[in-house]
Amino acid sequence: MASLLIALTLLAADAQTANILAVLPTPAYSHHAVYKAYVHALAKNCHNVTAVKPRLLDYALLNECGRIEQIDADMSLEQYQKLMAGSGAFRKRGVVADETTVTADNYMSLIEMFKDQFDNANVRHFLASNRTFDAVVVEASADYELVFGHLFRPATVIQIAPGYGLAENFDAAGAVARHPVHYPNIWRSSFSGEAAGALSEWRLLNEFELLASQRSNELLKQQFGLDTPTIRQLRDNVQLLLLNLHPVYDNNRPVPPSVQYLGGGLHLSQAPSHKLTAALERRLNESVDGAIYVSFGSSIDTNSIHAEFIQMLLESFVQLNNYTVLWKVDDTVPASVKLPSNVVTQKWFDQRAVLHHKKVVAFVMQAGLQSSDEALESRVPMVCLPMMGDQFHHARKLQQFGVARTLDTAVVSAAQLTLAIGEVIADAEAYRARIDDLRAVLEHDAAPAEKAVKFTERVIIFKHDMTRPARTLKTTSANIAYSDYFLRFPL
């Protein structure tokens, strides 16, 4: 009898185990800090995950009931570095890619990078194995990856974003996707003037329509065969969009249940803070008025920063000589300039450990979502120098909430930067009070990882198909062209 009960228990557990394919090719550390936490949460809930990804972050996890297999797209980091180097031609001061740089031509190289990754021998061998999966999870930032939902049909297709969603993601879900004032396109860098905003929204819509409907479709058919569906057809397969974000940052956008805001901070459960080295601990403790931490994230190639921008930073650091400045920067930069005596540079700092140190009084950063999560966790006021993508919008929201000062990175001077840093330090009590207020708003009803797993399991169990129309979380307007949405009505 006992043996029978054990067998039934094992069978029940096995029935609840899903085989999940996660296609996560973008070689950006901040993205994979989030994806790794999600994959680990799935494995801890006894799901088996096969991850197609670059090698920059190891997803290995031992002694869990679910297995993690990693398929290395090991050309991706090299290709990504080529992409970043090529983008230097249109980046202002070598770092700022504002909305004027967001064009189909500039972003085509990103799609070509994905194509090269999926041509990788490891990926080709995996595709030839004809394995089956219950779900395919892809990055929300690139429609090209949706082809895996077609290749492994009828698996449920899920998109995940390390932060904000794209307008195209919301269109596919049938959510409110576009408004020049209330729900601006996440690629926008300028938010003044309703007429200019509307024109920018229209241009961005057309640029990404060109990227998807023509160029991506052509590459998909070249790579996977003439019968490969179009991007618009592939979007129809998406049943769930997971956003590692609290909706307050997204202006509390109205969305259907197929769009789930996880609350943000998903990566924080994965990254326990380590102790600082003894030398760095001593340097911080000896700082006269405190320490300022400066980091522009993992996606900025500091070697491509223009010398004039480096000099602007150094002039500001000199004026802040009573503070120790910790500056995350590649080794080639300090080797080429004379550093002020109050500046300590390293290629990498344990950011959470630094921000948690009692002497750190300000954080100069690019307004990356994961970095701001860590600053809020540590109650450190921020000075934002946004450089690309969703950073402009996020920096704007942080300033609106009173937890940061935001400057125009393309034109900021040393005097302006010094003044902003001095302001957040001088008004530290007020900034920390507003940080505490924002943290209370961001408080989770459920842990982000728990919520992500719950909804992943739901769309797998209640698999949607045309014979079961009730089994969907999407709206009836999901993925409908605007011309049909506004102009075609059933009679």
Curated annotation (Swiss-Prot):
Primary enzyme class: transferase
Span of the signal peptide: 1-17
InterPro entries the record matches: Ecdysteroid_UDP-Glc_Trfase (IPR016224), UDP-glycosyltransferase (IPR050271), UDP_glucos_trans (IPR002213), UDP_glycos_trans_CS (IPR035595)
Family classification: Belongs to the UDP-glycosyltransferase family.
Name this protein carries in UniProt: Ecdysteroid UDP-glucosyltransferase
Keyword terms, alphabetized: Glycosyltransferase, Signal, Transferase
Pfam families (UniProt xref): UDPGT
EC number: 2.4.1.-
Origin superkingdom: Viruses
GO molecular function: UDP-glycosyltransferase activity
Organism encoding this protein: Choristoneura fumiferana nuclear polyhedrosis virus (CfMNPV)
Keyword Glycosyltransferase: yes
PANTHER family reported in the protein's UniProt record: EG:EG0003.4 PROTEIN-RELATED (PTHR48043), FI06409P-RELATED (PTHR48043:SF145)
Known role: Catalyzes the transfer of glucose from UDP-glucose to ecdysteroids which are insect molting hormones. Expression of egt interferes with normal insect development and block molting.
